[in-house]
């Protein structure tokens, strides 16, 4: 695995570094975030969304704009504190995928979905997304274009 060489960067807390290791019919890889001390492994797009969304919920950041309920109909409270940082910028910038590396900036989580941009590391490709479906479509578009 090659190391990505970049200038010293400061990564926002709401950024996910998606390291894509395999791409056939679906995407497989790892997600690194300042909000998690361990990589989030995913076998497909569904796991990518579910596991990272669960991490955001635990941290309360980016804040959700809807109330969540458990299966008993009870409201699940959202925490709105400053998130704990587990991964330093210097360490985050060294992470890269075997096929490609994407930085996903989640600006908000509205209407039970995500909004933000996808940036392919070391390339000019940037895609804006307004929903989970657009996020996954953008990731697959970048992978099909660049591989």
PLM segments and residue spans:
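Short aromatic-glycine-(Arg/Gly/Cys) micro-motifs in beta-strand/loop hairpins
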Residues: 20-36, 107-123
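Intrinsic disorder/low-complexity detector
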Residues: 1-18, 22-24, 52-112, 142-147
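Mixed-charge, glycine-accented linear interaction segment located at domain edges/termini
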Residues: 35-43, 49-57, 117-147
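Broad hydrophobic/π-residue packing in well-ordered secondary structure
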Residues: 14, 27, 41-45, 100-102, ...
């Amino acid at each position: 695995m090659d190391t990505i060489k970049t200038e010293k960067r400061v990564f926002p807390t709401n950024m996910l570094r998606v390291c894509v290791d395999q791409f056939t019919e679906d995407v497989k890889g790892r997600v690194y975030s300042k909000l998690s001390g361990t990589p989030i492994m995913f076998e497909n797009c569904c796991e990518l969304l579910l596991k990272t969304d669960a991490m955001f919920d635990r941290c309360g950041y980016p804040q959700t704009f809807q109330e969540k309920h458990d299966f008993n109909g009870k409201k699940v409270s959202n925490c709105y504190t400053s998130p704990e940082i587990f991964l330093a910028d210097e360490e985050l910038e060294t992470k890269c995928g075997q096929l490609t590396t994407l930085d996903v900036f989640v600006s908000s989580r509205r209407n039970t979905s995500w909004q933000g941009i996808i940036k392919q590391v070391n390339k000019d490709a940037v895609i804006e997304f307004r929903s989970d479906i657009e996020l996954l479509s953008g990731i697959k578009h970048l992978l099909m274009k660049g591989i």
